[in-house]
Amino acid sequence: MSARAPKELRLALPPCLLNRTFASPNASGSGNTGARGPGAGGSGTCITQVGQQLFQSFSSTLVLIVLVTLIFCLIVLSLSTFHIHKRRMKKRKMQRAQEEYERDHCSGSRGGGGLPRPGRQAPTHAKETRLERQPRDSPICAPSNASSSSSSSPGLPCQGPCAPPPPPPASSPQGAHAVSSCLDTAGEGLLQTVVLS
């Protein structure tokens, strides 16, 4: 350890200080007074050398610190600009989505005004049901028309006493409605034949 210490001191200290430190033990008492005279003049140059060495080391460390701070500031600026740009893009996307939704909603409301409402389609549906009921009721009208034609034919005399027509069976409300509709159609046909004749 004692041998390493002087080597480290030699590397750290400038040569003028090393010469003075190693020359001072060799000098003795009063005989060294003449040697101190020229050494006193060289002390100023030694101080300047020490100051220059310290300034060089300090300047190198200061340059390194400045470079590190600049790199850190650049990284922070890049991250902040990236986050700001990302927020702006999100806001633009939200605005575009709202505008598209408003346009679709307005166009749907305008287009829906021209379409017919469901309440207006009810009469047409009722008419269709009435038209569908008439062909269903037409087979019921056939036997009644046939019986009326056979009874009203004047060419065929009745042989013997004519039996009274059988009483109509008890009909349901639907059958009564069908018979009334058949009578209406038969009455219209008779009126047309009278007018034509």
From Swiss-Prot:
It is a single-pass type I membrane protein. Residues 94-179 are annotated as: Disordered. Residues 83-197 are cytoplasmic. InterPro entries: C11orf87. It is found in: Membrane. Residues 162-171 have a biased composition (Pro residues). Residues 147-161 have a biased composition (Low complexity). Keywords: Glycoprotein, Membrane, Signal, Transmembrane, Transmembrane helix. Glycans are attached at residues 19, 26. The chain crosses the membrane at residues 62-82. GO terms for cellular component: membrane. Residues 24-61 are extracellular. Residues 96-107, 125-136 have a biased composition (Basic and acidic residues). Residues 1-23 form the signal peptide. This is Uncharacterized protein C11orf87 homolog.
